[in-house]
Amino acid sequence: MPQSSPSAAATASDMDKNSGSNSSSASSGSSKGQQPPRSASAGPAGESKPKSDGKNSNGSKRYNRKREPSYPKNENFSNQSRRSNSQKSKTFNKMPPQRGGGSSKPFSSSSNGGRRDEVAEAQRAEFSPAQFSGPKKINLNHLLNFTFEPRGQAGHFEGSGHGGWGKRNKWGHKPFNKELFLQANCQFVVSEDQDYAAHFADPDTLVNWDFVEQVRICSHEVPSCPICLYPPTAAKITRCGHIFCWACILHYLSLSEKTWSKCPICYSSVHKKDLKSVVATESRQYAVGDTITMQLMKREKGVLVALPKSKWVNVDHPINLGDEQLSQYSKLLLASKEQVLHRVVLEEKGALEQQLAEEKHTPESCFIEAAIQEVKIREEALSGVAGGGGEVTGVVAALEHLVLMAPLATESAFQPRKGVLEYLSAFDDEAAQVCSLDPPGPLALPLVEEEEAVSEPEACEDAEVADDSLGEGTVGPEMSQEEPITKPGFTQLSSSPCYYFYQAEDGQHMFLHPVNVRCLVREYGSLEQSPEKISATVVEIAGYSMSEDVRQRHRYLSHLPLTCEFSICELALQPPVVSKETLEMFSDDIEKRKRQRQKKAREERRRERRIEMEENKRQGRYPEVHIPLENLQQFPAFNSYTCPSDSALGPTSTEGHGALSLSPLSRSPGSHADFLLTPLSPTASQGSPSFCVGSLEDDSPFLSFAQMLRVGKAKADGWPKTAPKKDDNSLVPPAPVDSDGESDNSDRVPVPSFQNSFSQAIEAAFMKLDTPATSDPLSEDRGGKKRKRQKQKLLFSTSVVHTK
């Protein structure tokens, strides 16, 4: 290393002289300080001069590195290992001068080294970090302002119940809310000492969980406790909607050191105070082919309770728990303290005592006793309030009576009012001009008729929109004929128009399909005049979940809260309900929907088979080859033919050749095909016409393919058989079928496959050989003339030209 210093100094001085720069002393001083480590691998300075005079004389670092890979000159790579030293002393620059580029650079390496570092940093930031080795620092300033919204956060949604962007743009979504889904699909028994007016104005308003005394769930199967896997005893439900046994959930909560624990199903927080009593009732699950009974429902606009038309009453407050007839149609059921005590608390106490008697000697008994203790505390609280609150209840009832009677007295003072502009409820933007109320007598009956008439076209309109929204039907011209249902002498006005629709009799959210609604409207004039109950066979059931778009299209279902699950059921209405003329009028829509169901079923079966085949291929199982043998034309069956000349020869000739007759079981399966496809020779047919099955010629009863072609025209005389009746479309390709063997029932013409065309061409050629010629070639032999050699016939050609 000390010997290389003079040569390196000489090289640096030569470079300074050639450059002619005034800053040569500074550059040479700095180059002397770092020349020894560079000169060891650079070699003599004279060798580097010619290389830098060419196209790389501009000082390009990329070309220098490619042509001299052993020379560590590239700043992007050489500077990385020395960056730690350069950071210690900013004034001391260890960067070597560029070879051969001193004359072309207007600035020296020492005075502008900082700018080069910036350029190198900018170039390095443009590439991925994987392209550089060693310690590196990546500029991440472009990530400083990067933010994202966490999943499930409803930051951009307003308090109106739907996203502000989601209504205008389809990509907007509303985050899933477990409590909203639970409250939309369940019925709640709440305490009666609270105000629930907000729940009658907005169906999406959540019930305060502290006011809930019991939750009622209607499901198609009885739920089971996910901890003990048995039907829950004294069941409790969490805010996330999962049901447990009371003793099981207490045992689970005791395992946590905190006052709460995560739900074992959805990992939501479960608090002991949030556990509510729950009762699950099993309902029938209807399927296609079942008979269902639907009843006519009536609901006023602006009211969120729909009741049967036969039991309809004006509902302005929640239904009481004791009303058994109407309790299944309300989301909220008011319960007094006595009702909660007798119908909720005491029933749970009895179930827990029975469970304790059965599992008294099990480790679970301590948690059962803890549940019984909590029931007793709740019982004492309710019984104390119920016993001491009798006087307060009487005072409140008297006050309510006074408040309810006050509007009746004040309303009579403003009775003689003239026509004013009245608006409907908040769910409808229409306004109607009310006529004078002076003659109330003759106008009373028309008002009722007008209310029915106004509500019915709206129900029909909802049915049309619902049909369009489902994408399964179109509105026909029949609906336009039903529009003038209203009487011409009346004005279309109504203070509270009603919706009419059909719902399942047991209270499930199953509604009648718009196609059936149009049939009933055509038959009876309006839904209000339709039967109160109809029974028919289920044809199709489509499930939906209530959303903002669905609510706008199905306005008669606006009383259902968001995320509420419901079904649209199509029935096969029969003449007892609707006439044959009505069914014929809507036969096109019914048939169209039937074809759509069949197509959907075929697509589902194809998808299932495709998935099954893919799964079998993964496991190494491939489908078996299936060769259908039902085509008797391509695979003829063995039949014993009777010769027409047997009757003329008599019984002796039949007995003489009886040894040559073959039975169907005397041949092997392989000889059946050869026997059927091999005709008789003309000699055998002439000499012994009684041979109906076969003949011997040249020690062989069979002919070669060339002999068969040579005597093909004479085959008809020697082979008596009944010509099969062929249809005109025998050579027509079969109906197009799919890969799974199911016809699509469409008029499309498929592309013919090579296999079908080849077999059909061969069959057509053989059929031409089977047809007898117009002139008999044997007559020429009898005349003494030599029979000419027949021209060979071409059976099949692939139209491929072979050149020599």
From Swiss-Prot:
Residues 1-31, 78-90, 104-113 have a biased composition (Low complexity). GO terms for molecular function: transcription cis-regulatory region binding; ubiquitin protein ligase activity; zinc ion binding. GO terms for cellular component: cytoplasm; nucleus. Residues 1-134, 589-611, 646-665, 715-804 are annotated as: Disordered. A zinc finger (RING-type) spans 225-267. Coiled coil: none annotated. Keywords: Cytoplasm, DNA-binding, Metal-binding, Nucleus, Phosphoprotein, Transcription, Transcription regulation, Transferase, Ubl conjugation pathway, Zinc, Zinc-finger. Pfam families: zf-C3HC4. Pathway: Protein modification; protein ubiquitination. It comes from the Eukaryota. Its EC number is 2.3.2.27. Residues 646-655, 795-804 have a biased composition (Polar residues). The modification Phosphoserine is found at residues 5, 110, 128. Residues 114-124, 601-611, 715-729 have a biased composition (Basic and acidic residues). It is an enzyme of class 2 (transferase). The keyword Ligase does not apply. It catalyses: S-ubiquitinyl-[E2 ubiquitin-conjugating enzyme]-L-cysteine + [acceptor protein]-L-lysine = [E2 ubiquitin-conjugating enzyme]-L-cysteine + N(6)-ubiquitinyl-[acceptor protein]-L-lysine. InterPro entries: MAG2/RNF10, Znf_C3HC4_RING-type, Znf_RING, Znf_RING/FYVE/PHD, Znf_RING_CS. It is found in: Cytoplasm; Nucleus. PANTHER family: E3 UBIQUITIN-PROTEIN LIGASE RNF10, RING FINGER 10 FAMILY MEMBER. Belongs to the RNF10 family. Interacts with MEOX2. E3 ubiquitin-protein ligase that catalyzes monoubiquitination of 40S ribosomal proteins RPS2/us5 and RPS3/us3 in response to ribosome stalling. Part of a ribosome quality control that takes place when ribosomes have stalled during translation initiation (iRQC): RNF10 acts by mediating monoubiquitination of RPS2/us5 and RPS3/us3, promoting their degradation by the proteasome. Also promotes ubiquitination of 40S ribosomal proteins in response to ribosome stalling during translation elongation. The action of RNF10 in iRQC is counteracted by USP10. This is E3 ubiquitin-protein ligase RNF10.
